[in-house]
């Protein structure tokens, strides 16, 4: 078994402090565009679905609108199905799978279920291909009241 740290920052087995988090963040670079690859796809769904901005994340100079896509019509008597993608930004298939589902299969559920799809919970993570947000917080471990992860708090 190896004791080698996943990141060459800090000490294995010790939680990161502010200095280690800043050191990690300084190594992060944008590798793809949330706007070009995700938001444009969501915009293309507006004719068939209700698209709403349920929040906004601001990290440094970057602002990320958060979108939810709902089936139309929304019928109170039907069960509701929630589909999320991109809680961890490096899980690209979840983001594109949610978008593909909306384009190709969502209409199969018309009259049977209300669909609420959040294709990309963590847009900064998506752009940087990271599990964490820029505060080194894992949004997937943070779906709770008073969440330290803004991505998770926006859905709470």
Locate each region found by the language model.
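Short glycine- and acidic-rich boundary segments immediately preceding or forming the N-terminal edge
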Residues: 1-67
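Short beta-strand-to-loop junctions in surface cap/lid or active-site-entrance loops
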Residues: 66-77
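Short glycine-rich or small-residue beta-strand-to-loop segments that form or flank ligand, phosphate
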Residues: 81-86
